[in-house]
Amino acid sequence: MLGAIWAQSLDGIIGDGEQMPWHVPEDLKHFKDVTMGAPVIMGRKTWESLNPKFRPLPGRENYVLSSRTPGQWSAGAQVLTAMPSLSDAWVIGGGQIYTATLDQVARIEVTLMGVNIGSTYGEKSIYAPDIPEDFGLAHSTDWLTSAKGHLALPDKEASDLPIKYRFLTYDRKDAA
């Protein structure tokens, strides 16, 4: 099954093309649990936004969609110019890759962060795609509070306010 996974704010923001606006360990664990053992597909900016000590993501084949020639920047990943034909993989970002592949996925895993980012990133804001109408909510958790999570917004100190989040799973209705 091809799936997509992302975290977004209440107002749909997933980041600024360089980083996510929060650090929520529970979300990182969920991401790891969902994607472990399966190939992951991402764009170059998402690849480059990963901490080099976690790149490539361990326990997963890492595919990077890019027109850029492979080189030192892509060490540990397979660089492709087109979406690979994989029956079991996770699309992990960024915004352009989600939009380009959403018609191919059967499941979408969303971590909804209980924060509004608003105009913090301005024109750099990257938004999650809208969930297509042919997907239905298959599972959701109640709102949870992160024990160690915090906002990590540019030009602001990390917020110690508790971050609420919930996990949402959407399945394509004709694939369920």
Predicted regions and their residues:
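Enzymes that bind and transform nitrogen-containing heteroaromatic metabolites
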Residues: M1-A176
